């Protein structure tokens, strides 16, 4: 049973690389949003044309980025990091939940209260990327961590 996992959320740490490396050899395909801030912010106007109003500039980018998110969201891991308010991550978690997708949240304990409703929608809340890898391994072949 292959897994297609969308790795959404903060872009300031190497959590994605840790999960991909830990899952090497597993039947998992990973995808993610575009993590280049400039490309993600400007993709809409670069492709569809300039906008005078920043609201519409951002809106075009959000729509184009949403295509990638919707196509990639089979099973989702959403990471909430220590820095910045990650509204996009919260939206991606809600989208995955709304689409009935399996959702794993990766967050530090200090976010527990703020994310209690998001966590309630998740099938698992992990603290470390290695725990996500362990969940994926268990789902694929029933193997528990040693």
Report residues per predicted region.
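Conserved catalytic or regulatory cores that recognize and/or transform ribose-phosphate-containing ligands
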Residues: 1-146
